[in-house]
């Protein structure tokens, strides 16, 4: 076995297979309290936010979320699928009961499940943006979990592929591409809805990037 640090007061312990020295399982051990979090027999440990750990089975992706910010671990939920991202109050999982939806959004307070077609996490703020299968765009605050944006997106009918980019301050970008991955439209959304769209512009845009925020929304 070996260990590495990743969470305050917690060690990530690893057990190795003798044959090939591959990692067989991981667990978390609190050096102050002696608490041991083992998960499944083949669990892997990963971070899912500040002070939030996920123990996930390597075989069937069953996952357990723990909040490690206090003196003791607090279990946030157990899931039958892999955890992709977490923000206080909700989690995005791989897979869905809907065969046409690749992800599921779960409200941890109510247990409500929502089919999701795309999601993204902003590396600056930790904000999480999800686009549901019925084209509702939601942006959650990465620190508090507050719902910053909850608006209906305006899909482009000709689009075959959609991508979502989460931005600070509750903003998000949607990009629609055709079957050849050529950009058809880029849209910017905030809490008040659609702020800007390249559809109908004389110039064709293929890329947009967040620079800073203004009183009228993000400056791209």
Predicted regions and their residues:
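Intrinsically disordered, low-complexity segments enriched in proline/serine/threonine
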Residues: 101-104, 157, 170, 220
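Surface-exposed loop/turn elements that mediate protein-protein interactions on large endomembrane-trafficking
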Residues: 1-7, 25-41, 61-78, 99-118, ...
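Short intrinsically disordered, low-complexity coil segments enriched in acidic
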Residues: 1-15, 28-34, 55, 86, ...
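Beta-strand C-termini and the immediately following turn/loop, strongest in propeller blades
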Residues: 12, 18, 23-27, 54-64, ...
């Amino acid at each position: 076995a070996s260990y590495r640090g990743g969470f305050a007061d917690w060690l990530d312990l690893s057990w190795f297979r003798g044959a090939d020295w591959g990692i067989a399982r991981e667990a978390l051990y609190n050096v102050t309290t002696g608490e041991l979090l083992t998960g499944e027999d083949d669990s892997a440990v990963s971070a899912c936010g500040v002070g939030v750990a996920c123990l996930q089975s390597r075989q069937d992706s069953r996952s357990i979320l723990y909040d490690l910010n206090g003196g003791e671990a607090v279990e946030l939920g157990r899931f039958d699928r892999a955890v992709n991202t977490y923000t206080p109050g909700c989690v995005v999982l791989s897979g869905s009961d809907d065969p046409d939806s690749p992800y599921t959004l779960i409200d941890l307070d109510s247990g409500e499940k929502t089919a999701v077609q795309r999601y993204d996490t902003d590396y600056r703020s930790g904000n999480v943006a999800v686009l549901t299968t019925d084209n509702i765009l939601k942006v959650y605050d990465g620190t508090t979990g507050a719902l910053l944006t909850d608006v209906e997106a305006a899909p482009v009918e000709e689009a075959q592929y959609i991508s979502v980019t989460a931005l600070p301050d509750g903003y998000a970008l949607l990009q629609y591409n055709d079957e050849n991955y050529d950009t058809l439209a880029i849209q910017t959304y905030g809490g008040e809805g659609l702020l800007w769209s390249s559809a109908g512009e004389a110039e064709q845009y293929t890329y947009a990037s967040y620079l800073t925020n203004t009183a009228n929304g993000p400056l791209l």
